[in-house]
C-alpha cells in the first residue's frame, strides 16, 4: 500500500436498539466518504453490517457461525457507489454481536492485503447493549486477546464508538461489553469513546485522517549539560474549506486521465516599452517608506533576515497563573519523548510531574527549522497521562511579543453611576439565564465537547458538494437537525424555560436609542468622561473653555454672527455647547446671515463673502452629519435667486464647489453624486 493510502472497514450496528440513531450514522459515514473523495481519492472502504436478519460473509460460508453479519461492500476504492451503500441502511431484527463483526472485518483486511504494510483501520459503531455469544473455546476475554494479537501483527488499528443516550441504565451485560472493548484498548492500538447524543456522534468519527508530521525532532535543551530528546507535533490545526481551483472542461468526457488543470503564467512588461517582457532577473521588489519607494533585492533581503540556529531552549519556569489564557496564539503543539528512548521517556515524565506538582510552566525559545526567519517564544504546560499505555507529555502554546499585543482599556462597571448599573432583580434574571444555558451542569455530561463537535459549516459544505455533483441545479438544503443543535440553543431548553426568558425581557425595558452626533476633534479634546457629561452641559469646565478659546478665539458674544468675521463667529457658535440644540441654532443663524447678504447686495459686492460663509456652512454640515439641512437651504436659494436673474451668484456657487452634499460625502444625504454635480446646471424655467 502507498504511504498515504488508507484501507478502512466500517462496522455498523443496525440492530433494533440502534434504529433511532441510524440516520445520524448514515450522515457521518457519508461525510467521511465525501471528504475522502476530495482529499484521499485512492483510499479504500469496506462496509460490514451486523444485527441484520440475513447473514452474508465469507467466514459464515467457510466455517459456519458469524450469523446476522452482512458484508454490504467489499474493500474497494472510494467512489459514489460507496455513498449509496451507506444510504438507507437496513433496520435489523437481531441483537448485534460486535465481536463477530470485528472478526469479519479483520478477516476482510487480511484477505485483501495479507502481510502488506500500510494504514489499515476498522471503525466500530455500536451501543454494546446486548449479550455476546460464547466462543467455542475459552472465554470472551481470551477471544479478545486472540483478535488483538492478530491486529498487532498486521498493524491494524480500531476506533470504537459506543452510543448510549443519557438516561439508559447500565446492567451487567453493558459493563461486560465495555470491559471487553477497554481490553482491546490495552492490548492493541484501539480508541474507545462514549457518546450520548446524535450531535456528539457526528464528531466522534474521524472523517478525515491527517497524517501526523513532526515539526521538530531534536533536543529540548534545559541546560548545556541536560538535554532531552523530543519530537514535536501539531496538536490542533484549523480545518479549512477545500481550496477552490481553476478547472477546464475542454478535455473530452471520455478521457479518464485528463487533469482538467488550468495553468496560469504571468508576464511583466515595461511601461515605457509595452511590448518588452521584463525577465525575472531584472525585476525587484520595492517597499514604501514615506513618500518614496525603496528597492530591496532578494539577496539584500536575505542578508537582512534574522537566521537563528535550529533548537529548542528552556529559558526558565514561572507560575501557571502568571500566563493568561488569552495570550495563547496560533496552533497548539505537543512535545513527546523520542519513541523508543527510555531515558527521554523518564526525563519527560519526571520534569512534567515536577512542574505539575509545583504548579509551574516553562518558557521556551523555539526555532523549528534551520534557516527559519522567525523565533517562537512560548509556554510549555505539563500533560500528565491517566492511561497506562499513554506517556506523559507537554503542550506548547506560542506567546505574543510586545508588537503582537493589542491593548484596549475599558472602564470598570463599578465606576458607572447607579442609574447605569443593573438592579437586584435585573442581575438575578441575568444570572438565571447563564445557569439555564450552562453546557456543563452539575451531574451531567458536558454538552458540545470540542472533541465531539464537528464544524457545522464544513459538514454542510460536504453534503451540498455531494448533492451538487448529482443534481447540478439543486438548491441549498435546509440545515440538518443535528447541526442546528450546534448553531442554535437547544429548543427543548428554551421551551422549558420560557417563563424565565419572559421575565428577563420584562425586567429590561427597551427604549429607543436616538442617533448620536459625531464628536468633533475639539469636543474629543475636552471630553472628561461619561460621568461628567450632564455637568459639562450645564457648566463647562475651565479646561474646556480654555481649549475651545485656544482653538476658536471668540470675536464677540456667542450666538451672534457679525459682519467683521462671520466665518469665525459661526465656528465659535459651534464650539459653544449651551444647549442640546446648539448645532441647529448655529446653522440657522448662518443661513439667515447668508440670505441677508445676498438680498442686501448692491451690485453683487457681497457675493464673495456670502460664498465664503456658504463653504463654511457646507463643511460644518458634513462634520456634524446634517447634510439635508445644507441641501435644503441651497435648493431654496437657487429657487429664489434663479428667477431674479442672478446668474453670477449661481456660477460662483458652482466654481467654489459649494453645491449639494452627496452620499459619498455624508451617508445621511439623499443626493447622489451626479445630482450634486448637475444641480447648478439646471435650465431656467421658461417665461412663457
Swiss-Prot record:
Localization per Swiss-Prot or TrEMBL: Nucleus
Catalytic reactions of this protein: ATP + H2O = ADP + phosphate + H(+)
InterPro entries in the record: Ku70/Ku80_beta-barrel_dom, Ku80, Ku_C, Ku_C_sf, Ku_N, Ku_PK_bind, SPOC-like_C_dom_sf, vWFA_dom_sf
Domain Ku: 222-430
Keyword ATP-binding: yes
SMART domains to which the protein is assigned, alphabetical: Ku78
Keyword hit for DNA-binding: yes
Cellular compartments per GO CC: Ku70:Ku80 complex
Domain of life: Eukaryota
Pfam families reported in the protein's UniProt record: Ku, Ku_C, Ku_N, Ku_PK_bind
Xref: CDD domains: KU80 (cd00873)
Keywords linked to the UniProt accession: ATP-binding, DNA damage, DNA recombination, DNA repair, DNA-binding, Helicase, Hydrolase, Nucleotide-binding, Nucleus
EC number: 3.6.4.12
Family to which this protein belongs: Belongs to the ku80 family.
Subunit field text: Interacts with KU70.
Protein name in UniProt: ATP-dependent DNA helicase 2 subunit KU80
Species, as recorded: Oryza sativa subsp. japonica (Rice)
Amino acid at each position: 500500500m502507498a504511504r498515504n493510502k488508507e484501507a478502512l472497514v466500517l462496522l455498523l450496528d443496525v440492530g433494533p436498539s440502534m434504529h433511532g440513531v441510524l440516520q445520524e450514522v448514515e450522515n457521518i459515514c457519508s461525510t467521511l466518504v465525501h471528504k475522502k473523495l476530495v482529499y484521499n481519492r485512492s483510499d479504500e472502504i469496506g462496509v460490514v453490517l451486523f444485527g441484520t436478519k440475513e447473514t452474508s460473509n465469507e467466514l459464515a460460508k467457510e466455517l459456519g457461525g458469524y450469523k446476522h453479519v452482512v458484508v454490504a461492500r467489499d474493500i474497494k476504492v472510494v467512489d459514489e457507489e460507496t455513498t449509496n451503500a451507506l444510504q438507507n441502511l437496513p433496520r435489523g431484527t437481531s441483537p448485534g454481536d460486535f465481536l463477530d463483526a470485528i472478526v469479519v472485518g479483520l478477516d476482510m483486511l487480511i484477505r485483501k492485503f495479507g502481510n502488506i504494510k500500510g494504514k489499515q483501520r476498522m471503525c466500530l459503531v455500536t451501543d454494546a447493549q446486548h449479550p455476546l455469544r460464547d466462543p467455542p473455546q475459552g472465554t470472551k476475554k481470551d477471544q479478545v486477546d486472540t483478535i488483538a494479537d492478530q491486529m498487532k501483527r498486521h498493524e491494524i488499528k480500531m476506533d470504537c464508538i459506543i452510543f448510549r443516550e443519557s438516561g439508559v441504565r447500565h446492567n451487567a451485560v453493558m459493563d461486560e461489553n465495555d470491559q471487553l472493548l477497554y481490553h482491546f484498548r490495552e492490548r492493541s492500538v484501539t480508541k474507545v469513546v462514549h457518546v450520548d447524543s446524535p450531535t456528539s456522534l457526528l464528531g466522534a468519527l474521524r472523517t478525515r485522517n491527517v497524517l501526523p508530521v513532526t515539526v521538530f525532532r531534536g533536543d529540548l535543551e534545559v541546560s548545556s549539560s541536560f538535554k532531552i530528546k523530543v519530537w514535536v507535533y501539531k496538536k490542533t490545526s484549523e480545518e479549512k474549506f477545500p481550496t477552490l481551483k481553476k478547472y477546464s472542461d475542454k478535455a473530452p468526457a471520455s478521457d479518464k486521465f485528463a487533469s482538467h488543470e488550468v495553468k496560469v503564467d504571468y508576464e511583466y512588461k515595461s511601461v515605457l516599452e509595452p511590448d518588452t517582457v521584463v525577465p525575472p532577473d531584472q525585476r525587484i521588489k520595492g517597499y514604501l517608506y514615506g513618500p518614496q519607494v525603496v528597492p530591496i533585492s532578494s539577496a539584500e533581503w536575505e542578508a537582512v533576515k534574522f537566521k537563528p540556529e535550529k533548537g529548542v531552549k528552556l529559558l526558565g519556569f514561572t507560575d501557571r497563573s502568571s500566563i493568561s489564557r488569552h495570550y495563547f496564539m496560533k496552533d497548539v503543539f505537543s512535545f513527546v519523548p523520542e519513541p523508543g528512548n527510555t531515558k527521554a521517556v523518564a526525563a519527560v515524565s519526571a520534569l512534567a510531574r515536577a512542574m505539575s506538582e509545583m504548579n509551574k510552566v516553562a518558557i521556551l525559545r523555539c526555532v523549528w527549522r534551520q534557516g527559519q526567519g522567525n523565533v517562537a517564544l512560548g509556554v510549555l504546560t505539563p500533560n500528565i497521562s491517566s492511561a497506562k499505555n499513554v506517556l506523559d507529555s507537554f503542550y506548547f502554546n506560542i506567546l505574543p511579543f510586545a508588537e503582537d499585543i493589542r491593548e484596549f482599556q475599558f472602564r470598570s462597571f463599578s465606576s458607572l453611576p447607579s442609574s447605569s448599573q443593573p438592579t437586584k432583580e435585573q442581575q438575578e434574571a441575568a444570572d438565571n439565564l447563564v445557569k439555564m444555558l450552562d453546557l456543563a451542569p452539575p451531574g451531567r455530561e458536558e454538552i458540545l465537547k470540542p472533541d465531539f463537535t464537528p464544524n457545522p459549516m464544513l459538514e454542510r459544505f460536504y453534503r451540498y458538494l455531494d448533492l451538487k455533483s448529482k443534481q447540478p441545479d439543486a438548491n441549498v438544503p435546509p440545515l440538518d437537525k443535528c447541526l442546528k443543535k450546534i448553531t442554535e440553543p437547544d429548543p427543548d431548553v428554551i421551551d422549558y424555560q420560557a417563563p424565565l426568558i419572559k421575565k428577563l425581557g420584562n425586567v429590561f425595558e427597551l427604549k429607543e436609542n436616538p442617533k448620536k452626533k459625531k464628536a468633533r476633534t475639539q469636543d474629543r479634546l475636552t471630553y472628561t468622561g461619561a460621568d461628567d457629561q450632564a455637568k459639562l452641559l450645564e457648566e463647562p469646565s475651565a479646561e474646556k473653555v480654555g481649549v475651545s478659546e485656544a482653538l476658536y478665539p471668540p470675536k464677540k458674544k456667542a450666538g451672534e454672527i457679525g459682519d467683521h468675521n462671520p466665518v469665525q463667529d459661526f465656528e465659535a457658535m459651534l464650539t459653544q455647547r449651551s444647549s442640546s440644540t446648539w448645532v441647529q441654532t448655529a446653522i440657522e443663524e448662518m443661513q439667515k446671515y447668508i440670505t441677508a447678504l445676498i438680498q442686501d447686495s448692491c451690485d453683487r459686492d457681497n457675493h464673495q463673502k456670502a460664498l465664503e460663509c456658504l463653504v463654511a456652512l457646507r463643511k460644518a454640515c458634513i462634520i456634524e452629519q446634517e447634510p439635508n439641512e445644507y441641501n435644503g437651504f441651497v435648493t431654496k436659494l437657487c429657487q429664489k435667486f434663479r428667477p431674479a436673474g442672478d446668474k453670477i451668484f449661481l456660477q460662483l456657487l458652482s466654481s467654489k464647489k459649494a453645491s449639494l452634499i452627496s452620499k459619498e460625502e455624508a451617508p445621511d444625504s439623499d443626493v447622489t453624486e451626479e445630482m450634486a454635480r448637475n444641480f447648478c446646471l439646471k435650465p431656467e424655467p421658461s417665461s412663457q
